[in-house]
């Protein structure tokens, strides 16, 4: 099995942040985002990485960013290492395929979730309240049902190791401002509807997904990642059957395994068997091939 890239360390480059998956380097006016093979579940980073996961996430994000350019601009300057600043070139072998040279935007203080199907925390909320983030839904929905129309459900941005909290659209307006929140909501729904139709033709259901936005030179742009198996629920269309959980092309497979363990969902993470690592990697790769027609 290929050795995963768990951490990066590039002498001469300033490490600005190390998140659950991405290492971010400050290049002055721009940023270098390196997507590692780290994987987290329940907000805990696993000890093992998933080989090629960083490559898959970067390529899927780049694919969707290109598809959505008619709706909103994104933060990418280039994904071709040859275009990166000269101080990045000594590390080209590690950076190739798993990194982005991006604009330095001011992130909005909310994460923007759109749900086209009822699953996960949304399903739990619906069971107890009949609503998600205060949005009342029809009675009688089953787990994994398609919603009558997609809904926008923002959340707070949590610190590393803590959980995001769902908030109402009205609360987002108080945090970010009504004008920008309304634009973000409209753009998020437009992106989702276009992506849902594209993915449907490729045999994938995008049940829900999460976006991050920023302001760059006074303009709203989309940043971070875009509709990857880390930020989305991807279900195989050919086996879709409402009334329960769905098989998926994302890390739900890993979550399901962890749910079978006597583990409190706090660090340290339990060791992952090689089979779980391999099968998780296969699901990520399958999503890339189905969407883009290309593998490694």
Curated annotation (Swiss-Prot):
Q: Per the record, what are the reactions this protein catalyses?
A: 5-amino-1-(5-phospho-D-ribosyl)imidazole-4-carboxylate + L-aspartate + ATP = (2S)-2-[5-amino-1-(5-phospho-beta-D-ribosyl)imidazole-4-carboxamido]succinate + ADP + phosphate + 2 H(+)
Q: Which terms are listed as keywords in the entry?
A: ATP-binding, Ligase, Nucleotide-binding, Purine biosynthesis
Question: Organism, per UniProt?
Answer: Geobacter sp. (strain M21)
- This protein's pathway: Purine metabolism; IMP biosynthesis via de novo pathway; 5-amino-1-(5-phospho-D-ribosyl)imidazole-4-carboxamide from 5-amino-1-(5-phospho-D-ribosyl)imidazole-4-carboxylate: step 1/2
Q: EC top class, in one word?
A: ligase
Pfam family of the protein (one): SAICAR_synt
State the protein's name: Phosphoribosylaminoimidazole-succinocarboxamide synthase
GO MF terms listed in the record are: ATP binding; phosphoribosylaminoimidazolesuccinocarboxamide synthase activity
According to its UniProt record, the EC number is 6.3.2.6
